Amino acid sequence: MNSMNQMNKDSNSINITGLTDEEVRQRVEEGFTNRTDISTDKTTKEIVVSNVFTYFNLIFLVITILLIMVGSFRNLTFLPIIIGNTVIGIVQEIRAKKTLEKMSLLNAPHADVIRNGSVKQISTDELVKDDVILLTAGKQICADAVVISGNIQVNESLLTGEADEVEKTEGSTLMSGSFVVSGECYARLEKVGNESYISKLSLEAKSMGGKEQSEMIRSINLIVKWVGIVIIPIGLILFWQSHFVNGESITKSVTSTVAAIIGMIPEGLYLLTTVALALSTMKLARKKVLLHDMKSIETLARVDVLCVDKTGTITEPDMKLKEIFLCKNSGADGTQTALTLDEIKSLILDYANASVDNNATMLALKAYAAEALTNNTSALHRTAVSQQAFSSSLKYGSVTFSDGTYLLGAPEFIMHEDFARIEEEIIPYADKGDRVLLFARYDGENVENGINGSVTPLGFVALANPIRANAVKTFEYFKSQGVSIKVISGDNPRTVSRIAIQAGIESAESFVDAATLDTEDKIADAVNKYTVFGRVTPKQKKQLVKALQAKGHTVAMTGDGVNDILAMKDADCSVAMASGSEAAAQAAQVVLLDSDFAHMPDVVYEGRRVVNNIQRSASLFLVKNIFSLLLSLFSVILMVTYPLEPAQVSLISMFTIGVPGFLLALEQNKDRIKGHFITNVMLKALPGGLTDVIAVGALVVCGEVFCISDASIGTIATLVLSVVGFMILFKISEPLNGMKYAVIIGNIAGLVFSGFFLKKLFALTDLSNICILLMIVFGFAAESLFRNLTLLVEKLRGSYEKKKGFNV
């Protein structure tokens, strides 16, 4: 409330009244609002359309019509599964969408707007053209505007790629999408909604190809793409061969071809992925974690280096002034300043009252100043002539009074080569983890361009920043999961190191002053050598992230301020605290809405659970696809009719792939993700797929030799494939537990029940003694073949990895 009153006072002092309610209403009617037509989220209609009108659903529709035309109704058993898959996919996506929309409202950007002569806070999409808004540090500029009063430093790197801060004064143009680094100004909106720069840029980016996909989604799309390409020509060849070469009836030719096509379609893979990700999104939302980007779940699961800022991440976001003390070596000759401690305190409190900054440090000083005023302390009697907001690159701010200019900031950056003179006075506080700022008098000009005059250190401000209660436990988790921590902060490296040690971060005693890392080569060497980086500029944070990525690491960056945005933008995954700057929260892929860093293990765990389980279940689906593709090629080469019917394929898929695959996707899994998704999935599926095709291929040959009927061969093949399917399920489910045993036993029971009581529905026939004997022999042979093929693939993979020196 006090800050809002201050805003009202400031706006009145420079006679800014803003728009009236009538003027706002008129602009809304004319369509000059800040709402855009660009959305990265699907509408409910788009979700339904994307799930119903798919390429594979079109194929299923065609083969359904063909089966109805030839009267093969029992082979439509796949239809309820396809319809169920589609409905479940739609329902879960819509549920996830509604959950995310509710959570997004909590993180929606707001603006301080001047209307009817007073300041009010509204959502940015409620702004209209010609509105006057107040911009302060940490705010993202929500529409194109022009500065009408004040002075700010703006970072336009998200738009232009240039990391340097740009000064904006009265008359300067502000581009939407940039963010305020420091200072304060009033700006009038000129282009809003679809007409703003960021909207046009977003529209152009959307038309050029949409969002980047995660490795898992790219891999699944690649698999589906190639299956989609080969499925039609193979299907046509199989039908031609069966009907025109082998002389089979239309009904037999259609059903055998449909069986091959159904086997090649990974119909449950997309559904499995969609549902698993949707459930994870909703689960994290209940823990106050908002995902701006779905791929961030997978990326965080693959992270092996986590970069964290100190304030707001390791420590609580709020700071408290601990002590103000005199500088003992104020003069060049080592003498103490002539000013008394009370006089220094008075100056510092006047500085705090005049400062335009609202960061954690200045809020602590302003709280102290407010308390001093309440206690009638002799302070707050100087009027500022000018102010320079704190700069993340310069590491200090300034206020000029009638009697001179005063600086407050990092001692090293204010004193430069004279820092050694006062360093010993700071060390005892830094060793306790306190943030220590230097208050100094400046005798020079143009302090905004750097210090070029004499500086007289007067005193120090020590601020306490308590460690989060759960920080130690959180960092212990990351250590146990093989995730390295890098602490990247703008504070004194000794202070940051001490805080990191208290938080239990491994090797936190290894620290470096980033001011000494003045080349990219030095930064590249430092990322391996040090854990704590102090006095880091925003540009250096970005360079450190890139250096880690260049060494093959998957990097996540957490932060809460505008000085973290550059690094967050280039990190593989970015995480922001909602209590920090609005710009950081909007730029991040993951937002911790309650700003509790202890939720990070939940996000990493959820990502690992989802990716590992999808990877495992995807292997089950691909076994069927590999088998069906290779068996189709086998049938074409040997000029035999495809031996299975669609109903038999549906039976095998239901109990050895579909149901267990979905249940296993909900299993707990904390394992770190290794290797590439498509490689892992293919290598796990290959032994099973090869076993299936060799077993069924040999069975077809035996059937020809011993004149066994096609119906009996189909039944034997179904049972043998089921045996192999459960062997694969056992292998993929390792290590087994009670839940996994229950899933496997339940599906075996379901298959046995269907085999005995639903034989006609699934095209199963009674077997003669020779057929039963053949089934037993092939069952044992398939078990041995699968076991040895699995060992062979694992051995070949191990040899390749050993040779290359990395995980495939």
What are these regions (language model features)?
Residues L58-P80, I229-I265, A278, M282-K288, ...:
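Helix-interface capping motifs at the ends of transmembrane segments in multi-pass membrane proteins
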Residues L236, W240, G247, Y396-R421, ...:
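Cytosolic catalytic headpieces and adjacent flexible linkers of membrane translocases
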Residues N12-G18, E22-S39, V87, R95-L105, ...:
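Actuator/coupling domain of P-type ATPases
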Residues S178, R302-P457, L463, E476-Y477, ...:
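Cytosolic catalytic regions of ATP/NTP-dependent phosphoryl-transfer enzymes
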